[in-house]
Protein backbone atom coordinates (compact mmCIF):
# COMPACT_ATOMS: atom_id res chain seq x y z
CA UNK A 1 0.00 0.00 0.00
CA UNK A 2 1.11 3.56 -0.62
CA UNK A 3 1.92 5.87 2.25
CA UNK A 4 0.87 9.49 1.85
CA UNK A 5 3.10 11.59 4.11
CA UNK A 6 1.67 15.02 4.95
CA UNK A 7 3.39 17.63 7.05
CA UNK A 8 0.49 19.31 8.83
CA UNK A 9 0.82 22.85 10.14
CA UNK A 10 -0.68 26.32 10.12
CA UNK A 11 -3.41 27.10 7.61
CA UNK A 12 -3.11 23.66 6.02
CA UNK A 13 -4.13 22.03 9.30
CA UNK A 14 -7.09 24.35 9.65
CA UNK A 15 -8.26 23.57 6.13
CA UNK A 16 -8.02 19.83 6.73
CA UNK A 17 -9.92 20.13 9.98
CA UNK A 18 -12.89 21.61 8.11
CA UNK A 19 -13.14 18.57 5.84
CA UNK A 20 -14.96 16.23 8.23
CA UNK A 21 -16.85 13.32 6.65
CA UNK A 22 -19.92 11.90 8.36
CA UNK A 23 -18.41 8.42 8.21
CA UNK A 24 -14.75 7.49 8.05
CA UNK A 25 -13.53 6.31 4.65
CA UNK A 26 -12.46 2.72 5.34
CA UNK A 27 -10.48 2.65 2.08
CA UNK A 28 -8.24 5.42 3.42
CA UNK A 29 -6.87 4.83 6.93
CA UNK A 30 -5.97 8.19 8.48
CA UNK A 31 -3.39 7.66 11.22
CA UNK A 32 -1.79 10.53 13.11
CA UNK A 33 1.84 10.14 14.15
CA UNK A 34 4.58 12.37 15.53
CA UNK A 35 7.77 13.39 13.77
CA UNK A 36 9.40 13.63 17.22
CA UNK A 37 8.68 10.29 18.86
CA UNK A 38 11.38 7.83 17.81
CA UNK A 39 11.50 4.87 18.03
CA UNK A 40 7.69 4.79 17.92
CA UNK A 41 7.39 7.24 15.04
CA UNK A 42 9.65 9.59 13.12
CA UNK A 43 9.57 11.97 10.16
CA UNK A 44 10.66 9.22 7.77
CA UNK A 45 7.88 6.86 8.85
CA UNK A 46 10.49 4.38 10.11
CA UNK A 47 9.13 4.02 13.64
CA UNK A 48 7.81 0.63 14.65
CA UNK A 49 4.32 2.07 15.21
CA UNK A 50 4.44 3.52 11.67
CA UNK A 51 5.14 -0.02 10.44
CA UNK A 52 2.25 -1.42 12.45
CA UNK A 53 -0.03 1.23 10.94
CA UNK A 54 0.97 -0.05 7.51
CA UNK A 55 0.07 -3.61 8.53
CA UNK A 56 -3.38 -2.43 9.64
CA UNK A 57 -3.97 -0.64 6.34
CA UNK A 58 -2.83 -3.68 4.35
CA UNK A 59 -5.09 -6.03 6.30
CA UNK A 60 -8.04 -3.66 5.84
CA UNK A 61 -7.40 -3.30 2.11
CA UNK A 62 -6.93 0.43 2.66
CA UNK A 63 -4.38 3.06 1.71
CA UNK A 64 -2.39 4.33 4.70
CA UNK A 65 -2.68 8.09 5.08
CA UNK A 66 0.03 8.74 7.68
CA UNK A 67 -0.61 12.26 8.93
CA UNK A 68 2.68 13.44 10.42
CA UNK A 69 2.39 16.18 13.02
CA UNK A 70 5.48 18.17 13.93
CA UNK A 71 4.53 17.93 17.59
CA UNK A 72 5.40 15.74 20.52
CA UNK A 73 3.25 12.62 20.78
CA UNK A 74 1.38 13.85 23.86
CA UNK A 75 -0.42 16.33 21.59
CA UNK A 76 -1.69 13.84 19.00
CA UNK A 77 -5.17 13.50 20.50
CA UNK A 78 -5.66 17.24 20.93
CA UNK A 79 -4.11 18.41 17.68
CA UNK A 80 -4.81 15.39 15.50
CA UNK A 81 -7.88 13.41 16.55
CA UNK A 82 -9.85 16.31 18.02
CA UNK A 83 -9.17 18.51 14.97
CA UNK A 84 -10.30 15.70 12.67
CA UNK A 85 -6.96 15.45 10.90
CA UNK A 86 -7.02 11.70 11.52
CA UNK A 87 -9.12 8.92 12.99
CA UNK A 88 -6.57 6.52 14.47
CA UNK A 89 -3.54 6.47 16.78
CA UNK A 90 -1.27 3.45 17.07
CA UNK A 91 0.22 2.69 20.48
CA UNK A 92 -2.05 4.12 23.17
CA UNK A 93 -2.63 2.77 26.65
CA UNK A 94 -5.48 0.27 26.69
CA UNK A 95 -8.58 1.95 28.04
CA UNK A 96 -7.45 5.52 27.29
CA UNK A 97 -10.69 7.37 28.04
CA UNK A 98 -10.14 9.97 25.32
CA UNK A 99 -10.50 7.31 22.63
CA UNK A 100 -12.13 4.03 21.74
CA UNK A 101 -9.42 1.40 22.18
CA UNK A 102 -8.96 -2.04 20.68
CA UNK A 103 -7.98 -5.17 22.52
CA UNK A 104 -4.28 -4.82 23.40
CA UNK A 105 -1.84 -6.11 20.81
CA UNK A 106 1.15 -6.16 23.16
CA UNK A 107 2.15 -5.56 26.76
CA UNK A 108 5.49 -4.40 28.14
CA UNK A 109 6.82 -2.31 30.99
CA UNK A 110 9.45 -0.09 32.50
CA UNK A 111 12.95 -1.47 32.67
CA UNK A 112 16.44 -0.89 33.97
CA UNK A 113 19.20 -0.56 31.37
CA UNK A 114 22.84 -0.95 32.37
CA UNK A 115 26.12 -1.86 30.76
CA UNK A 116 26.65 -5.60 30.97
CA UNK A 117 30.05 -5.09 32.56
CA UNK A 118 28.44 -3.33 35.54
CA UNK A 119 26.87 -6.60 36.74
CA UNK A 120 23.68 -4.93 37.96
CA UNK A 121 21.31 -7.31 39.73
CA UNK A 122 17.67 -6.68 40.54
CA UNK A 123 14.20 -6.42 39.02
CA UNK A 124 12.33 -4.39 41.67
CA UNK A 125 12.15 -0.61 41.44
CA UNK A 126 13.80 -0.38 44.87
CA UNK A 127 16.90 -2.03 43.39
CA UNK A 128 18.15 1.27 41.95
CA UNK A 129 19.46 1.93 45.46
CA UNK A 130 22.71 0.02 45.06
CA UNK A 131 26.28 0.98 45.82
CA UNK A 132 28.10 2.20 42.73
CA UNK A 133 24.93 3.23 40.89
CA UNK A 134 24.62 6.96 41.46
CA UNK A 135 23.75 8.62 38.14
CA UNK A 136 20.48 7.88 36.35
CA UNK A 137 19.14 8.77 32.91
CA UNK A 138 15.42 8.78 32.19
CA UNK A 139 12.70 10.52 30.23
CA UNK A 140 10.93 13.37 31.98
CA UNK A 141 7.34 13.11 33.26
CA UNK A 142 7.70 9.35 33.81
CA UNK A 143 7.53 6.96 36.79
CA UNK A 144 11.34 7.07 36.84
CA UNK A 145 11.11 10.36 38.72
CA UNK A 146 8.93 8.74 41.40
CA UNK A 147 11.32 5.79 41.69
CA UNK A 148 14.28 8.09 42.28
CA UNK A 149 12.35 10.22 44.79
CA UNK A 150 11.24 7.17 46.77
CA UNK A 151 14.79 5.78 46.87
CA UNK A 152 16.35 9.11 47.85
CA UNK A 153 18.28 9.50 44.60
CA UNK A 154 16.29 12.25 42.87
CA UNK A 155 17.89 15.43 44.21
CA UNK A 156 21.45 14.16 43.80
CA UNK A 157 20.67 13.37 40.16
CA UNK A 158 18.97 16.68 39.24
CA UNK A 159 21.94 18.53 37.77
CA UNK A 160 22.96 15.57 35.64
CA UNK A 161 19.39 15.04 34.40
CA UNK A 162 19.05 18.73 33.52
CA UNK A 163 22.21 18.45 31.43
CA UNK A 164 20.41 15.96 29.16
CA UNK A 165 18.21 18.80 27.92
CA UNK A 166 21.10 21.30 27.93
CA UNK A 167 19.59 22.93 31.03
CA UNK A 168 16.62 24.10 28.95
CA UNK A 169 14.05 26.11 30.89
CA UNK A 170 11.03 23.83 31.47
CA UNK A 171 8.61 26.57 32.46
CA UNK A 172 5.52 26.92 30.26
CA UNK A 173 6.77 24.42 27.68
CA UNK A 174 7.03 20.68 27.12
CA UNK A 175 10.63 19.52 27.42
CA UNK A 176 11.77 15.95 26.90
CA UNK A 177 14.90 13.81 26.72
CA UNK A 178 15.15 11.76 23.54
CA UNK A 179 14.89 8.03 24.17
CA UNK A 180 18.10 7.44 22.25
CA UNK A 181 19.96 9.87 24.53
CA UNK A 182 18.77 8.03 27.64
CA UNK A 183 20.43 4.84 26.37
CA UNK A 184 23.60 6.33 24.86
CA UNK A 185 24.30 7.97 28.21
CA UNK A 186 24.48 4.50 29.75
CA UNK A 187 26.49 3.02 26.89
CA UNK A 188 29.01 5.89 27.02
CA UNK A 189 29.34 5.78 30.81
CA UNK A 190 27.61 9.10 31.51
CA UNK A 191 24.88 7.35 33.49
CA UNK A 192 25.18 4.26 35.65
CA UNK A 193 21.62 3.14 34.95
CA UNK A 194 18.61 4.13 32.85
CA UNK A 195 14.99 3.78 33.92
CA UNK A 196 12.86 3.73 30.80
CA UNK A 197 9.75 2.25 29.16
CA UNK A 198 11.19 -0.81 27.42
CA UNK A 199 9.62 -0.16 23.98
CA UNK A 200 11.31 3.27 23.99
CA UNK A 201 14.70 1.72 24.68
CA UNK A 202 14.74 -1.65 22.91
CA UNK A 203 16.00 -0.45 19.53
CA UNK A 204 18.89 1.44 21.07
CA UNK A 205 19.83 -1.38 23.42
CA UNK A 206 19.80 -3.76 20.46
CA UNK A 207 21.99 -1.51 18.31
CA UNK A 208 24.45 -0.38 20.97
CA UNK A 209 28.11 -1.13 20.29
CA UNK A 210 28.60 -1.41 24.03
CA UNK A 211 26.80 -4.54 25.29
CA UNK A 212 23.84 -3.49 27.43
CA UNK A 213 21.44 -5.36 29.68
CA UNK A 214 17.73 -4.52 29.87
CA UNK A 215 15.75 -5.88 32.83
CA UNK A 216 11.99 -5.43 33.16
CA UNK A 217 10.84 -4.09 36.52
CA UNK A 218 8.47 -6.64 38.03
CA UNK A 219 6.70 -4.70 40.79
CA UNK A 220 4.56 -1.57 40.90
CA UNK A 221 4.90 1.58 42.98
CA UNK A 222 2.58 2.27 45.89
CA UNK A 223 2.71 5.97 46.70
CA UNK A 224 2.59 7.25 50.26
CA UNK A 225 -1.07 8.19 49.69
CA UNK A 226 -1.93 4.63 48.65
CA UNK A 227 -2.20 5.36 44.93
CA UNK A 228 -0.71 2.59 42.77
CA UNK A 229 1.56 3.59 39.89
CA UNK A 230 1.75 0.68 37.44
CA UNK A 231 5.02 -0.02 35.67
CA UNK A 232 3.58 -2.42 33.08
CA UNK A 233 1.19 -1.32 30.34
CA UNK A 234 -0.96 -2.89 27.63
CA UNK A 235 -0.84 -1.10 24.27
CA UNK A 236 -3.81 -0.73 21.93
CA UNK A 237 -4.90 1.11 18.82
CA UNK A 238 -6.97 4.20 19.58
CA UNK A 239 -9.92 5.26 17.42
CA UNK A 240 -11.72 8.59 17.41
CA UNK A 241 -15.02 8.45 19.29
CA UNK A 242 -16.63 10.17 16.31
CA UNK A 243 -15.83 7.16 14.10
CA UNK A 244 -16.75 4.00 16.05
CA UNK A 245 -17.39 2.20 12.77
CA UNK A 246 -13.59 1.85 12.40
CA UNK A 247 -13.13 -0.11 15.60
CA UNK A 248 -14.40 -3.45 14.27
CA UNK A 249 -12.31 -3.46 11.06
CA UNK A 250 -9.20 -2.48 13.01
CA UNK A 251 -9.81 -5.26 15.54
CA UNK A 252 -10.04 -7.70 12.63
CA UNK A 253 -6.86 -6.28 11.09
CA UNK A 254 -4.99 -6.72 14.37
CA UNK A 255 -6.03 -10.36 14.41
CA UNK A 256 -5.32 -11.16 10.76
CA UNK A 257 -2.05 -9.22 10.86
CA UNK A 258 -0.92 -10.58 14.23
CA UNK A 259 2.03 -12.54 12.85
CA UNK A 260 3.37 -9.48 11.02
CA UNK A 261 2.88 -7.25 14.06
CA UNK A 262 4.58 -9.75 16.35
CA UNK A 263 7.50 -9.90 13.91
CA UNK A 264 7.85 -6.11 14.03
CA UNK A 265 7.89 -6.12 17.83
CA UNK A 266 10.38 -8.99 17.91
CA UNK A 267 12.69 -7.33 15.39
CA UNK A 268 12.55 -4.17 17.50
CA UNK A 269 13.76 -6.19 20.49
CA UNK A 270 10.87 -5.25 22.77
CA UNK A 271 10.52 -7.56 25.80
CA UNK A 272 6.90 -8.70 25.82
CA UNK A 273 4.71 -9.68 28.76
CA UNK A 274 1.63 -11.92 28.78
CA UNK A 275 -1.63 -10.06 28.28
CA UNK A 276 -3.19 -9.13 31.60
From Swiss-Prot:
Q: Which top-rank group of organisms is this from? A: Bacteria
Q: Does the keyword Lyase apply?
A: no
Single GO cellular component annotation?
periplasmic space
Q: What InterPro entries does the record tag this protein with?
A: Methanol_oxidation_MoxJ (IPR022455), Solute-binding_3/MltF_N (IPR001638)
Q: Where in the cell is it found?
A: Periplasm
> What keywords were assigned to this record?
Methanol utilization, Periplasm, Signal
Main location (coarse class): periplasm
What is one process in the GO biological process aspect for this record?
methanol catabolic process
Annotated signal sequence range: 1-24
The job of this chain, per UniProt, is described as:
May be involved in the assemblage of active methanol dehydrogenase and/or its cofactor PQQ in the periplasm.
**UniProt name for this protein:** Protein MoxJ
Naturally occurring in which organism (per UniProt): Paracoccus denitrificans
Amino acid sequence: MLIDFRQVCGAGAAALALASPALADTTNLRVCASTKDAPFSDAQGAGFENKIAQVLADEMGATLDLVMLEKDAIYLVRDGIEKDLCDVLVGVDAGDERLLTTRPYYRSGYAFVTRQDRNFEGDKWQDVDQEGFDTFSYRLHSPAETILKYTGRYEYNLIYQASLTNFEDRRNKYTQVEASRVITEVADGGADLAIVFAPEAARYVRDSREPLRMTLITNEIERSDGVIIPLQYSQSVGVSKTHPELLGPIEQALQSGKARIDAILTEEGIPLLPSS
